[in-house]
């Protein structure tokens, strides 16, 4: 083995397999770009992002960990969200939940 060498099996990797998802249209109504990270509670994103927040409660972007989606001013785009896993307890972010979902 060589230090840092990876042994990867053939095939596809499916992220978040078996979890509930929802697709929402999101519009940036602000005058600045807004970037949302992979594990940010989407319900609590910047108020300049307009979308059905009730459907986003307990959800995050369905993208690879450590990545983000950027919304330019005036831009609308569809995003897929995936339900949060684990204890489903939310603290921090914008302080809109601060407890169990």
From Swiss-Prot:
Catalyzed chemical reaction(s): urea + 2 H2O + H(+) = hydrogencarbonate + 2 NH4(+)
EC number of the protein: 3.5.1.5
Record GO cellular component, one term: urease complex
Location of this chain's protein in the cell: Cytoplasm
Keywords assigned by UniProt, alphabetized: Cytoplasm, Hydrolase
Molecular function GO terms recorded: urease activity
UniProt key word Amino-acid biosynthesis: no
Biochemical pathway: Nitrogen metabolism; urea degradation; CO(2) and NH(3) from urea (urease route): step 1/1
Quaternary assembly: Heterotrimer of UreA (gamma), UreB (beta) and UreC (alpha) subunits. Three heterotrimers associate to form the active enzyme.
Family: Belongs to the urease beta subunit family.
Protein name: Urease subunit beta
Gene it is expressed from: ureB
């Amino acid at each position: 083995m060589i230090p840092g060498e990876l042994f990867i099996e053939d095939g596809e990797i499916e992220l978040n397999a078996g979890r509930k998802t929802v697709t929402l249209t999101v519009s940036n109504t602000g005058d600045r770009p807004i970037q949302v990270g992979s594990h940010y509670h989407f319900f609590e994103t910047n108020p300049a992002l307009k979308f059905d927040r009730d459907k986003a409660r307990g959800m995050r972007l369905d993208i690879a960990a450590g990545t983000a989606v950027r919304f330019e001013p005036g831009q609308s785009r569809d995003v897929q969200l995936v339900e949060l896993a684990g204890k489903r307890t939310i603290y921090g972010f914008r302080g809109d939940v601060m407890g169990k979902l």
